[in-house]
Design a protein with these regions (language model features):
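C-terminal beta-sandwich/jelly-roll accessory domains of carbohydrate-active enzymes
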Residues: 214, 218, 222-225, 576-667
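Compact, charge-rich alpha-helical regulatory domains located at protein termini
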Residues: 661-740, 744
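Extended substrate-binding grooves/exosites of carbohydrate-active enzymes
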Residues: 25-38, 118, 123, 129, ...
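Compositionally biased low-complexity segments at domain edges in trafficked proteins
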Residues: 145-149, 153-170, 264-284, 640-672, ...
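Extended acidic/polar, glycine-enriched regions
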Residues: 102-108, 177-259, 611-612
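An acidic-aromatic loop/edge-strand motif
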Residues: 7-9, 15, 26-40, 100-172, ...
Length: 745
């Protein structure tokens, strides 16, 4: 029988280049748990060598095989046993295995896994707005199987493929196929289907060289986000009254559609997908999360009331997909084809390989409904080869899985009539109107215009959001002040925009949790992207979390916002309450001060007494309370110093421009720099680069320098392109161009 032995203990990690001393570690492990998010501006990208010993397990009968199973190695790995290479792997997010039987000997065997998170021209991701953690961050197993066993060699897959389909009579068919290695005529495969209570509801037997079968289950329980009913399909490899190997898959019976006018429906029920995106890291753990960590994340998202998760920007842990199956989420799963296109043909083959692994390894998960081809891949510009690669990926996915839909996350400035459309089945845009560019009020009109002009495209929003730092507060929140209040205000608006448009097939807030991004330094917090509805340590739910809970949760809730804005000045102050109940009653120091009937957001203007005040909100059977202190002046530490500095910097920029006519048509004289030159080209001239980087800093608060941080992601962009994506003051891009065209190439 199959035996799975964890090899997570007793590893030695060394660094051949000597960056760090040798240490003893336990898996899951990453060497970037701290420097990947501590704000120092860089993190260790190198090769680490993990070493331990193991004793080869023995099968009762001769001919048994031993496999090393690596659940993920970021980003590339070489597996050796006793100094001999067993396998290599490029791609940091998927399972891979190696048959090491013939490399083992009696007694202790040395297992070495060389792992690198360095960039290569042949592998994705190239550059992106998150930390590329290095290490064996999901664990390693030893698998012992008889000589005849279910497949372990095909793209890290489970060896079994199940396709449930509901039937018109209320039942369901289960198309099942498994693959047997070294099969012989005497072996058969026994299939059994059990419902969620453990009752067998169907079974079948097939010869091991022709394992495909269709089984019927009457009165099938459907899987949906509200009722995630699971069936367990077990395959047993048998001969002479003996089971030699056994595998299983948890599956769900469901059907779903997406149309441009009706959006998403599951099992015939219109159900707009509203949820979040998620990265797989946590404070000072990096991406080395345990099964418990993954389940906790899924539970927090369920508590939010979301029904969909975009798992960005790579394959996630089986533990998390299992949680999504169990708890009920519609999942968008994708590969790290992101931000920067690599023209090396081997890079496209790596894309194909990662997509194949993603689908083969995760085909049985009922929660997965969409395969994502790429994310913001036009950041570095467009070329025919890039478009062709997307068509090729679409064809590949269709061949591997004709049962699911494909999708794509367009960068905000992707032309609405360009060649990147009509490749995937459904599409989404990453839009940050109200943060990087434009105003939050533009989101609804943009969707309406796109829908009217492209009535044949199923459109969604794959990213949207703002940074929210729980230290910063304001009574007059503004874009780029990084306050918790502006983040909440933004999400109040967007939540209503999406509720008013059920034809938007899916929306995914960016992001559920703050996450590591070593290159960032924004809002006074370095090393992280702070757009999460919760903090990176999972300790604090920002007010924006409760905006969505009020809109999405079916459980009664009420939440008073602004509890960290605890000191208030002025004759009156606004008390904002989020609730999914129709009416909220507010009490201040035990006295009723107001009752409102509203939709999700309730605002009360109240007078506070000197000193501390108890605020109580009651909505039906649910209550919430906070304490506020009335003060003469609110503390200066509520305001991010950089916010005022940035405003002053923009003002000084225009002062230095002087009397230039910023309304005149822009000129682009030959032989001189302009906003049409890429950052990489501008970097060839010290003066031009200084101008451009200062402009980027003022407009985005990003510090970019050649070879540092997000330079690789942004170097192909032009200031002209950036201006279409980010919110620049009127005349700003014109003034930059007017200064650049004075500099000769």
């Amino acid at each position: 029988m199959r035996e799975i032995i964890s090899l997570n203990e007793n590893w030695t990690l060394s660094f051949p280049k000597g960056e760090r001393p040798t240490e003893q570690v336990t898996l899951p492990h990453t060497w970037n748990a701290v420097d990947g998010m501590d704000g120092n501006g860089s993190y260790l990208r190198t090769t680490g060598v993990y070493t331990r010993t193991f004793t080869q397990p023995k099968q009762p009968l001769a001919g048994g095989r031993t496999y090393v199973e690596v659940l993920a190695a970021a980003l590339a790995a070489t597996v050796k046993v006793n100094g001999q290479v067993a396998t290599t792997h490029e791609g940091g997010f998927s399972i891979f295995r190696a048959d090491v039987t013939d490399l083992c000997h009696e007694g202790d065997n040395e297992l070495t896994i060389e792992v690198s998170n360095e960039d290569t021209p042949s592998m994705y991701p190239a550059s992106a707005d998150f930390t590329f953690y290095g290490g064996l961050y999901r664990g390693v197993n030893l698998i012992s199987v008889p000589g005849t066993h279910f497949d372990l060699d095909y793209f890290g897959g489970p060896g079994i493929k199940v396709t449930p389909k509901p039937t018109e009579d209320g039942g369901a068919t289960f198309e099942i196929e498994s693959w047997v290695t070294n099969g012989e005529e005497a072996y058969t495969v026994m299939y059994s289907i059990e419902d969620c209570y453990g009752n067998e509801v169907a079974s079948g037997v097939r010869p091991c060289d022709s394992t495909k079968v269709t089984l019927y289950v009457p009165d099938a329980q459907l899987w949906s986000m509200d009722e995630p009913n699971l069936y367990t399909v077990t395959a047993r490899l048998q001969k002479n009254n003996e089971t030699f190997d056994e595998i299983y898959a948890n599956v769900g019976v469901r059907s779903y559609t997406v149309t441009p006018n009706d959006g998403f429906s599951i099992n015939g029920v219109p159900t707009p997908l509203r949820g979040v995106a998620r990265h797989q890291d946590c404070l000072y753990k990096g991406n080395a999360l345990t099964a418990e960590d993954h389940y906790e994340d899924a539970m927090l998202i369920k508590e939010l009331g979301a029904n969909t998760i975009r798992l960005a920007h790579y394959q996630h842990s089986q533990d998390f997909y299992d949680a999504c199956d169990e708890l009920g989420f519609a999942v968008w799963a994708e590969i790290p084809f992101i931000s920067v296109f690599k023209k090396d043909p081997s890079a496209h083959q790596n894309c194909r390989h990662q997509m194949t692994e993603l689908i083969i390894q995760n085909y049985n998960h009922p929660s997965i409904m969409f395969w994502g081809l790429s994310n913001e891949i036009l950041i570095g510009g467009i070329c025919q080869e890039l478009v062709d690669n997307h068509h090729d990926l679409q064809k590949l996915v269709r061949e591997l899985d004709p049962t699911r839909l494909t999708t794509i996350a367009h960068v905000s400035n992707t032309p609405v009539d360009g060649p990147m459309h009509h490749i995937t089945d459904v599409e989404s845009y990453n839009h940050y109107f109200g943060w990087y560019g434009g105003k939050m009020e533009q989101n609804g009109p943009w969707l309406d215009k796109f829908h009217a002009e492209h009535p044949d495209i199923c459109i969604g929003i794959s990213e949207y959001g703002t940074e929210g730092i729980i230290n910063w507060h304001s009574n007059d929140p503004q874009c780029k002040d990084y306050t918790e209040e502006y983040q909440a205000l933004y999400h109040e608006h967007l939540a209503q925009v999406f509720e008013d448009r059920p034809w938007v097939w899916a929306t995914h807030c960016w992001n559920m949790f703050d996450f590591g991004c070593a290159a960032r330094h924004e809002g006074g917090v370095a090393g992280r992207n702070n757009k999460g509805l919760m903090t990176i340590d999972r300790k604090t739910k920002k007010d924006s979390y409760f905006v969505y809970q009020a809109y999405w949760s079916k459980l009664p809730m009420v939440h008073i916002a602004g509890r960290r804005h605890a000191q208030r000045a002025g004759e009156t102050t606004e008390i904002k309450v989020y609730s999914n109940q129709d009416t909220v009653v507010l009490y201040v120091n035990g006295k009723e001060v107001g009752q409102q009937t509203a939709h999700r957001v309730f605002k009360f203007n109240v007078a506070l007494e000197e000193g501390f005040n108890t605020i109580l909100a009651v909505a039906g059977d649910v209550k919430d309370s906070i304490t506020l202190e009335k003060v003469e002046k609110e503390p200066d530490y509520y305001t991010l110093p950089e916010f005022n500095e940035r405003q002053e910097g923009v003002a000084n920029w225009f002062k230095q421009v002087g009397s230039l006519d910023l309304k005149a048509p822009m000129e682009f004289p030959e032989g001189y720099y302009s906003i049409k030159d890429s950052m990489e080209d501008l970097s060839k001239n010290e003066e031009a680069l200084a101008l451009a980087t200062r402009a980027v800093k003022l407009a985005t608060n990003f510090d970019i320098k050649p070879g540092v941080g997000m330079w690789d992601m942004m170097k192909r962009m032009t200031p002209e392109t950036m201006a279409k994506m980010i919110n620049m003051p009127d005349g700003f891009i014109e003034s930059l161009n007017a200064q650049l065209i004075k500099i000769k190439k």
